[in-house]
């Protein structure tokens, strides 16, 4: 009897928990950059990837800015090195920054921007 009660309880609770988790909406972000002018823009917590890209370009402010990185439900960072710019995503700001500096792989790399969704 007790096993049947626990089983019924589990069958009732687990789907409710799964529904709660799937009800959390995705949040999107983007980083735009124009290397020559060092202009950048970030967007985060947008309901759609396109919204994030449009906002990042708007924040960048230069006509020749480009979206260099898109991310979802996490963080992203942008670093500029002697020859190129790099971007990376991570679950946290620290993880994204660590990844991008490793990818840049130069002592002269500098962090330019970062952003995280909720």
Q: Each PLM stretch: what is its role?
A:
Residues 2, 17-118:
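Helix-coil modules at protein/domain termini and other flexible surface or pore-lining loops
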Residues 6-18:
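Hydrophobic h-region of N-terminal signal peptides that target proteins for export
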């Amino acid at each position: 009897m007790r096993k049947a009660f626990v089983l019924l309880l589990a069958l009732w609770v687990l789907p409710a928990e799964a529904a709660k988790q799937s009800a959390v909406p995705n949040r999107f972000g983007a980083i735009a950059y124009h290397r020559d002018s060092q202009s950048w823009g970030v967007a985060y917590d947008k309901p759609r990837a396109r919204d994030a890209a449009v906002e990042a370009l708007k924040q960048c402010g230069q006509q020749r800015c480009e979206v260099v990185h898109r991310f979802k439900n996490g963080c992203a960072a942008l670093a500029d090195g002697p020859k190129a710019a790099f971007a990376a995503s991570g679950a946290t700001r620290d993880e994204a920054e660590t990844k991008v500096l490793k990818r840049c792989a130069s002592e002269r790399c500098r962090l330019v921007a970062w952003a995280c969704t909720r």
